[in-house]
Amino acid sequence: MQESVTINRTYKDRLFKIIFEDKKELLSLYNALTGKNYQNPDELEINTIDDVIYMHLKNDMSFILDDWQNLFEQQSTFNPNQPLRGFFYFADLYKVKYFGKKIYSTRLLKIPTPQYIVFYNGTANMPDRKELRLSDAFQQPDRKSVV
């Protein structure tokens, strides 16, 4: 009789969320990554997306601090499309916060600057730090994009 083994591929993701849903731990991580020394966890405005219905996207932890819209995500598989996924997450975060807030005004609506950090803990050999850019996916990468 052969038994089948079920592998839980989301345990690392859940552990990351459990640890860093605590504002004090999240602030400590932010300070370690940025070299800042924030002391008050209540300054964090947590705005994590649990499930974006139409895309079935989830993020691990997102928050606003000091005019930065931060998105932290843990991945055990390298994905060169991570910047595109981040673009979708940020669009939804901004939509939730700013939809209906005078976006048709003649005055510029200032928004927090996006910062997307992915923590890789997979088995493939990867550098300690690797920058991925959304523009790397553009079909005409040398052409300056304008919105």
What are these regions (language model features)?
Residues M1-V147:
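Accessory alpha/beta interaction modules
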